[in-house]
């Protein structure tokens, strides 16, 4: 999409907003392909920002954490079934704000990045994850043995 839109943006500038993930900023266990793909989106975004900034084209990426969407229902189960309840409970536990994000919150970030209010922001990957990535290691927050298996 970027390849085809850049020529149209050359005269008037604009804002490109790519969707990455916090998994592109720090690797998730057993998700190497996904981590690499999202890390690639982040570095692609930075490259576009550098290459086209003089044309008044800004490029940023959003890096959502766990957002309450149908994708979460498909991958982890709905908020009504046991698997979905367990997944959501675990996500809330490791999130300093104690909840999952909402699509509306992500949309507001995208709207801000598309607006002139963010005219001096480019080449950034902005996490919207409720503070999950503020921890050096999620196990620090858990205070129990749930993460010991991944340190061996």
Question: Language-model features: where?
Answer:
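Alpha-helical segment proximal to the catalytic Tyr-Lys
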Residues: 7, 50-54, 119
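Active-site helix of classical SDR
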Residues: 2, 37, 45
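Residue(s) in the substrate-gating loop at a strand-loop-helix junction
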Residues: 21
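Short, flexible catalytic-loop segment of classical short-chain dehydrogenase/reductase
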Residues: 64-74, 134
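Active-site loop-to-helix junction immediately N-terminal to the catalytic Tyr of the SDR YXXXK motif
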Residues: 27-36, 47, 75
């Amino acid at each position: 999409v970027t390849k085809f839109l850049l020529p149209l943006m050359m005269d008037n500038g604009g804002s490109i907003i790519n969707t990455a993930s916090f998994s592109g900023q720090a690797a998730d266990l057993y998700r190497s392909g996904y981590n690499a793909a999202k890390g690639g989106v982040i570095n692609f975004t930075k490259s576009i920002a550098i290459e086209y900034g003089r044309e008044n084209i800004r490029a940023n990426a959003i890096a959502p954490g766990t957002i309450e969407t149908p994708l979460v229902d498909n991958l982890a189960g709905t908020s009504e079934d046991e698997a979905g309840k367990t997944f959501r409970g675990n996500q809330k536990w490791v999130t300093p704000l104690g909840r999952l994000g909402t699509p509306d919150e992500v949309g507001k970030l995208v709207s801000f990045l598309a607006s002139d209010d963010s005219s001096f922001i480019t080449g950034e990957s902005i996490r919207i994850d409720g503070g999950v990535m503020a921890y050096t290691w999620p196990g620090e927050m858990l205070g129990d043995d749930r993460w010991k298996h991944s340190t061996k």
